[in-house]
């Protein structure tokens, strides 16, 4: 019995997103970058407005890793995946719990949207967008 290509693609995307989140928690830069396109584009919560290219994306994590090292958390929830034959997107929520030592009680939940494209038969992240609601 053949598996539905859409469900196979969805399972691959979910696995890729979960492995990315695990890599973030482990501060494993090579695993974080493993499925990103060299010319990827990112919109993040902190400035700048956009990051173009894998090296700019790599550099952005240097601001976040110290926060994790102090006990911050990074957990995905409400993951939803939509796939086509060669493009897909995923959206989820990222709960960022404050480090215990920060004294802050207001954890942050941000929105995540990731755009994927099939490149040489592999799902590749071409766009990543993190945002929070404007007040």
Named regions from a protein language model:
Residues 2-34, 41-135:
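A beta-strand edge to alpha-helix "cap/lid" segment located at domain peripheries
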């Amino acid at each position: 019995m053949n598996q539905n290509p859409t469900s196979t693609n969805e399972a691959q995307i979910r696995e890729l997103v979960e492995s990315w989140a695990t890599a973030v928690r482990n501060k494993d830069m090579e695993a974080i970058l493993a499925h990103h396109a060299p010319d990827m584009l990112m919109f993040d919560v902190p400035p700048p407005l956009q990051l173009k290219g894998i090296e700019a994306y790599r550099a952005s994590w240097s601001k976040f890793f110290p926060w994790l090292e102090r006990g911050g958390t990074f957990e995905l929830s409400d993951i939803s995946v939509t796939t086509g034959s060669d493009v897909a997107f995923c959206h989820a929520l990222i709960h960022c719990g404050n480090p215990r030592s920060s004294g802050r009680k207001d954890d942050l939940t941000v929105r995540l949207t990731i755009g994927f494209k099939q490149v040489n038969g592999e799902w590749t992240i071409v766009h990543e967008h993190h945002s929070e609601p404007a007040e």
